[in-house]
Amino acid sequence: MERAGVPGFSPRRSSVEAKMQSTSCSVRKSSTVTAWPAVVLLLSWGQRRGG
């Protein structure tokens, strides 16, 4: 049950996790930027239909 055989595993994993975090953040930003026009279009379309 000892993990002394993989000493260089945790720093690599932390860097990978940090990279994934930054990528997910940028993906979230880009997804919101691309989703806003669609949301505005849907809202205006719904208002036009309702009115």
Curated annotation (Swiss-Prot):
GO terms for biological process: actin filament organization; regulation of epidermal growth factor receptor signaling pathway. It comes from the Eukaryota. Pfam families: MIAC (PF23701). Residues 1-22 are annotated as: Disordered. Reduces filamentous actin fibers by interacting with aquaporin AQP2 which leads to inhibition of the expression of SEPTIN4 and integrin ITGB4. Also inhibits the activation of the EREG/EGFR signaling pathway through interaction with AQP2. Inhibits head and neck squamous cell carcinoma (HNSCC) progression in vitro. Also inhibits renal cell carcinoma progression in vitro. Interacts with aquaporin AQP2. This is Micropeptide inhibiting actin cytoskeleton. It comes from Homo sapiens (Human). The lineage of its organism: Eukaryota, Metazoa, Chordata, Craniata, Vertebrata.
